[in-house]
Structure formats: C-alpha cells, structure tokens
C-alpha cells in the first residue's frame, strides 16, 4: 500500500483458522534468470492473450526480466510463464550492470531491476524501473528507464490510454552545486548519475502519477537522493526533487520493496 506500513487492517479472508502449518505454506516453485529483490505482485482475473483468464504473479529479476506466472498452479500449460520480457540485448551492447562496475557488493553479480514495480489495475499497466549498461561506438553509458507494460502480454505501452513507453529517466537543468565536481555540469546544475544512482524503494502510483526514488550502490559518491514524478498516461516527467542541493548523499533507501 502507498502508506508503506505493510499492514492490511481490514483483512477479512486470512484468519488464524486458515493460516496455519496444515493449510498455509509454499504451493510450488518457478525458476527465474536472476536474483529477485523486488516484491512479487499479484493481480487477479487477468485475461492473458490466447491463454484464458488467470490469477497472475509478476516477478522482476536483477537480470532485467519480468515474468508473469499463474498464481494457482504450475502444472500442465502453467509450468511455463504466461509471458516473459527481458530488457537487455547483448548483441547491441545493452546488458545489465555488472557488480564490478559499481564499486560495491550490495547486489551481486549484476544489477537490473531492484525496485518493486507497481500495477495500475484500471488500465492493466505494470510500471517498472530498469537499469542497463549500454555501449555504443565504444562509449559506455548507464541508463535508467521507466517502462509501462500491458499486464496481459508484457508488451510496451506505446500508444492508447498509456503511451510512449519506455522513457529515459533523467534530471535536466536541476539547480544546485552538489559536491562541486563530477556531479555537476559546471553551470549551476546537478547531474543525475546513471552509474551511481540506484532505484531502491517500490514505485508508487498515486492520483495518476508514477513516483520513483533513488539512492546509491553502497554509498559510492557522488550520488544524491532523487524523487521523480511521471504522468501515468503519457509518461511525461512532471516533477523532480533532489534531497541534497548543495551537498551529496541523502539517498531515498529501501531494499527493493516498500509495501
């Protein structure tokens, strides 16, 4: 929930009578391609294209994959994912970020998707933050993107009620002095450092806006705490806030979850 207290104070289904060692526990397992720091998300009664209606569990990995699994059974046709998408393309120079690039061992051996995505049940859209390492013509960059995916197929939302996915996350002409070195442009603006910044807290959807927050990899400077707001329909950036305008650190922390 958006209050981040991790409690449902109006629970009516789970009770001490049905949550016990005899009737409650692990149902089955699925294999995925990387470590999972983000909390799995559940959406009920999802019409999967060509596969009928399912209760779905959505799982994000540090290998930059999103899986949609049937939440009730892994038998028969449900032994395979209902769909899977991946956001790397090694042949084109797009990979996850190796831990060796980061100067920190907080997450190993790679960094991709850490923050828990968020679902808009009205539009059937999954919003997810993805970090990649991209090498083009010998030049390396570290890129953060906000993706909006159709929960029924995993396809990017490029047009319609939710459009323009994906978008690159950045802060342009944000005023401040920062540390006064590589975290500024020398013209009074603080830079969003794609290598140093790490999306930690779960994404939040509130009043049609998607919120993303950032800290670092093991306090490797220069980094800042950032909070971004994007329109949930157009994916246009509508607001940016930085916690440390005249210094560094100030990260917005979480282990990848938040709910």
What are these regions (language model features)?
Residues 1-259:
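Mobile, glycine-rich extracellular loop/lid and propeptide segments
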